Amino acid sequence: MAQKFFQASGKLAVQCYKRELETAFKSRELAGFQILDLQDFTGQGTALVGILNAFMENKGLITADDWRSFCSDCVLMLSFPSFVYEEGMKFSYRILFSNMNPTELKDARIVVTMQNKVTGERMRNETERMHFTQTRLSEYADGTFRIPECGVPQVYEVHVEIEGSSIENSYEIYAFPKCHSKLGLSLIHISEPTRLQLIS
């Protein structure tokens, strides 16, 4: 049980790092950021709060390549309003790119896919070919996917990449069937403070 807890809390820490760092990359008001530490602290006790263990070894929470997808000199991101959707809704996104690398990417395009993690069903959007130069933050095309009808909850991976490069990123979104049941008023009970009795 302890191992499952450490794994689950560690995965949550990774997601928190990802959201926080991407927020910094998406801001035009920040010149940079500094992460205090990435490893577990074992000084006066034990604090298993790091992405790496006390010996700077991988704990199995995230691979180095996946970490670089949101913490690097080139970070490709999607901006979207929610991680949770009902079937039939539109998943709308905007492509953002923070490029601190002086190397220019020529004649490349951005590809965005949304894949069902159970069935493998996949949808794809792509931009026109373009040049990517060193810029603090650039905004590119908007796009939309429609969430398919589903009888049970589904998880989708939304993947974005610059074709022909190692620059990529991914997100998980969750889709649920529409809820048609309504809560009847007969099931609601209201208690007034004057009617409550103190049981001693």
Regions found by a protein language model. Give the residues of each.
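Substrate-binding clefts and catalytic carboxylate motifs of secreted carbohydrate-active enzymes
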Residues: 1-107
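Beta-strand-rich interaction surfaces with strong enrichment in secreted/lumenal proteins
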Residues: 81-83, 127-133, 146-147
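Beta-strand-rich binding/interaction modules
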Residues: 90-130, 140-143, 154-163
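Surface-exposed, short loops/turns at beta-strand junctions within beta-sandwich domains
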Residues: 149-153
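Short, exposed coil/turn segments at beta-strand boundaries within extracellular/luminal domains
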Residues: 164-168
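Low-complexity, Pro/Ser/Thr- and charge-rich linker/hinge segments at domain boundaries
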Residues: 170-188
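Single conserved hydrophobic/aromatic residue that forms the stacking wall/gate
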Residues: 188-199
